[in-house]
Amino acid sequence: MPIGQPKGDEYSISIYKRVWDKTITHRYFEYPFPAWFYGFLAGIQEIFLGKNMIVGELQAEAWPPNGQSIPETSLVEQNKSLDASRLKDRFNYGKATGMKNIILWGGEYWYYREKILNDPSLWNVAKEEYK
């Protein structure tokens, strides 16, 4: 919640579902929060602050381990954090929050996978979702 001025017209929240834990477990970690949790946060802040909340960034891109960049990470490794099935689940998760505006982080990644890695799986999921 903003403390000073100016205050925004609406607030946003970032949702990263599957990330690399480089500090404790050194493995991929899936945040356990159900979609309704974010909808609940949005509802509470709307009640108290009267502002709409959007998903300003929903993870829809692979999260490479150990600070690697996407190009230096194998496709097999990238699929451990985001494959076509997980992307489909991510779209459904975003919708299940109940928020009307969801901005996805990863469109350029889907394009990269299709054009550079010759893997259209994510691009195809996105095409189906945006019909």
Regions found by a protein language model. Name each.
Residues K51-K131:
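Substrate-binding cleft of secreted/luminal carbohydrate-active enzymes
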Residues M1-Q68, S121-A126:
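Glycoside hydrolase catalytic-domain groove-lining segments
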